[in-house]
Amino acid sequence: MKKYLCTALALTLATACQEAPAPESPAPIVGPATAARIDSLLQDFVNNEQVAGISALVYEKGQEAYFGAYGYSDRDNGVPMARNTLVQIYSMTKPLTGTALMTLYETGAFNLDDPLTKYAPEFENMQVYTGVDADGKMLLEPVKRPISIRDIARHTAGFPNRPDIPGLSEALAAADPLNRENTLEEMAAKFGALPLWFQPGAQWEYGPSVDVQAFMVERISGQPYRDYLQQHVLDPLGMQETRYYVPEEDRGRFSAMYRLDPEAGTLTQLPDSTAKIEQLHHWPLARGGWGLTASLNDYMRFARMLLGKGTLEGVQVLRPETVELMATNHLPDSVTERSWLPGKGQVGFGIDFAVRVAPPASAEENNGVVGEFFWDGAASTLFWVDPHNDLAAVLFVQLFPYDPIKLHKKFRDAVYGPYTQTAQPGSK
């Protein structure tokens, strides 16, 4: 009897297991409706003559989920915006520089809280600006602590960067450390001879810190920065079209630059002779903070590596724990002066990325997900990595001034859908 009862119980359990519904997979963020919404948005930007050309690429759960390109990369000559169009990525150069720096971190070459002076005596005995006297002479005090590598990674070093600091801005202009004829070593020596604008670690201020990161890569590795970046980041990722210099044979697909006057509603194509001067010549200075060009596919390979916790298609560029470190907020609450960073939303700052630390507080803020990390460029380009939804997005355009039409917010809304106060995009 026991045998039959056991058999019956086993059959009942097996039937119940077979009939139990499989767990429901989360719906993708980018389905047909989302793709149509993105298409409509990008087309509207072109139709309304707010941009000449625009393209976007989204990967989700390891697959291409969206690609679209609209308008012209060169409106005057009728060249369409395409997947292989080359654009100036400006400050989206910075995360690539940070990645190069962190490959050295992984070898034990430095610690984040090491002082710069451990590797670069150019930054010894620095003074800090406190104002000017009645005669306009700068007033200075000693640094309370040395600049650390963490400071240059999160923009708290104190390097001057603005044209409106009495006395200090004039000294910065005279030293001209970012002149493209300088080498990185000459640049560092000139910054080291200038006063800092504020005490290291006291506030967040966007500036030349990532250019100093490039110098540190060169100093610690013993290789020219361009070569190190190529060997340790670009080549392993197959980013063959991410370069400081665009050769003659590729210039036909190198996008023109445009300037929008939102009030007048006019979109002007800028002369290549000025807009592309950085990329049409070989200059001594390889800036870590900007200067690279890239194709949409190339930059997505970088974003996918980050989404893959440091690995793309079996090639490891960074360890998972290093990517996590870079995508962690490194700004303590004591750093309350943060310039325009709060305009990016509920964010802190990691190692060359903004890091979302809270959901959007209102529909007016940029949409996004806690844990995402991102950055953008002066010509209105954008990328982000969303580990929560296993999603990465890249938006390419060449538009000055920086995002005058809220295209970043609108693109994020198109990807994630309307803002809701109760749930993050992709949450159940």
Language model regions located:
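Structural recognition of the beta-strand scaffold that forms the well-ordered cores
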Residues: S55-L57, Q88, D151-R154, E205, ...
